[in-house]
Structures are given as C-alpha cells and as structure tokens.
Amino acid sequence: MSYTAASQVVARQLAFFEGRKVLIAGELSDAYPVELANVAQSVAVFTTNFGYHNSMSRHDNIDCHFGVQLDAKLDIDMLLIYWPKAKAEADYLMSMLLAKFGPETEICIVGENRSGVRSAEKMFQPYGPLTKYDSARRCSFYWGRCDNEVKPFDLNDWFKSYPINVSGVELTVRSLPGVFSHGEFDNGSKLLINTLPSLRGKVLDFGCGAGVLGAIMKAKHPRIELELCDISALAIESAKETFKVNQLDAKFTATDVYSELKGPYNYLISNPPFHAGLKTFYTATENFIAQAPNYLFSDGQLIIVANSFLKYPELIEQSLETCNALANTNKFTIYSAKK
C-alpha cells in the first residue's frame, strides 16, 4: 500500500509512538493510521472530512471521530497532527485539541514543507517547545510538549464574519478556518449567481463551503426547498451559521459526494471543489457529474461554474448528453445540462 510523503516520514519515527495512545488529526488522506496501530497501544482519529471518516470507520482497530470539534472523552497521551494547507486551520486544530488534553500532552507534527509546516515552531510557542527531528521527502517532522496552561476552546471565537452584496442581496457570511470563501466571495460564484435561472422545487448546493451560494439562492428564491452539502464538517458548521445569522432555512448534510443524499432534485448547483489539501483534486466533481442523472428529476438541470481550462464539458456530455455554456469570462465558464 502506498502512503503519502508525510506518512512515510512518520514511519521513520515510530519510536515516538511505540506503546502510546495516539490521536491523529489534520490533513489525513491515506490509511497509515491502520499501520501505526500495529506499533501504538491505541490509535484514534479525529477528522473534519466525512469521506475520510467513512473509510477509517471500517477498521476495527481505529477509533474514528468526525465533526467540527472533538467532543468524545478519549484517553490520549500523544497527538499527531498532519499539517493542513490553511495556517488558520492548523491553529484551530492545535487550540481545540490542546485545550481538550491540556498540559503535559506530547505532540508530533508532520507536513509537506510547501504546506507551511515550517511555521509550526513559531505557532506552537504559546504552548511549549517544539523541535524538528526529521526532514525528508520534502516534509518536516517535529516533536513537542504542551507545558503551559491552555485557554478554553470556544468555537464562536473562530468564526470570521464579512458582509457581501451580490445581485441586490445583502448578507453576512460566517466561516471557519479552512473553509472555501473564508473571508471573501470569489468571482466564479458571483458569475454563477448572476447567471442562474429562476429556481423552483428542490435545489442542491453541492460543495457548499460557507453557504454563500445557498444563502443568496434562498434569499432570492425563498420558496425553494434547499439542501446544502459538503464533505467538510467545518463547511457544514459555517453554512449553518451563515443561514442562522441571516434568518434563512435549509437542510444541511455532511456527505461524500452523494453518499448521504436522497434526491431527486430539480437543480444540482455547484462551484465544485478541485483543490483537496495541496493536490488538485477532480475525483469528487467527476463523480458528482457522472451520477447527476440518478439525482435529477426528469426535467432537472445541472448548473456548475468552473475554471475554463478544466475539461468538464466532456464529462457533462458523457453523463447528460448535452452541455451548454451559459456565460463565461476569461477565467470562468458556467456550464449547464438538462436531464
């Protein structure tokens, strides 16, 4: 089985984990926790990624937890954090986990150098010492210990709020670290909003992020039956907060593409993700498009915005036979297809 570069570096440092009760969190994407369980006394995983949670939950020797924060009471004496791409998300994870497990907790941090992991030493200073022990495969590995008291973790402290005014709709957006649209409303989403037809019936906002698209759609078309979904617990919690602060209602679902969705829908609408961590990632969007006919009513419509260089028209034509470009700029294109 192949492991990520970060996991390969962890495998060089097994002495840190022998006989320990380890909690792993962060930018996890492979099955290395299962391998580590052969060395550690126990291995638990905390993830904000619903797809990863599903894959790890199949293993009897892994105690897997999904959510926006870790609520379960666990007996842990070592944290292993895979450094996220977003520095704010790394800060969030350390603050949340160290507040839970407190002083004298040991921590190992691993990550690709281009992910910003080399800032870990400075970011860990409020908690205690952190020392680099390995550097290989363009990754760095650190060990440290929380020696200082940690202030209680309050999720509300981590939301960023910002106003938007798009297509005549004024809203407040609430987003957590690591969530798409954390602090800004992107031009692709603006183009999509300004291109959408008059919506009716059941509408799915796929890959909802902080809920910006969904909130605008609901504000402009209050009678639609709207569902927002995302693979990220941080995104789902952000979207819920965005809707709450704007007094809007919708259904929110954590899902791995269609895994938890029922359908059918009148509209599948998305600014689909193509970045997962540091790697360009098309698989989720490919599956979203390929399975779209199974989740659309007979007259249902798929509408997505994408970078113009991406090969989505071919995928859409394979799935729904025809693909139309409704609008475009020099960077983005709105694609549409009817069942």
Swiss-Prot record:
Q: What is its main location?
A: cytoplasm
Q: Which Gene3D superfamilies match?
A: Vaccinia Virus protein VP39
Annotated keywords: Cytoplasm, Methyltransferase, rRNA processing, S-adenosyl-L-methionine, Transferase
- The EC number of this protein is 2.1.1.172
Subcellular location per UniProt equals: Cytoplasm
Q: Name one GO molecular function term.
A: nucleic acid binding
* Pfam families on file: MTS, MTS_N
Q: Which InterPro entries match?
A: DNA_methylase_N6_adenine_CS, Mtase_sm_N, rRNA_ssu_MeTfrase_C, RsmC/RlmG, SAM-dependent_MTases_sf, Small_mtfrase_dom
- What family does this belong to? Belongs to the methyltransferase superfamily. RsmC family.
Q: What does the record note on quaternary structure?
A: Monomer.
Q: What does this protein do?
A: Specifically methylates the guanine in position 1207 of 16S rRNA in the 30S particle.
Q: What is this protein called?
A: Ribosomal RNA small subunit methyltransferase C
Q: Which gene codes for it?
A: rsmC
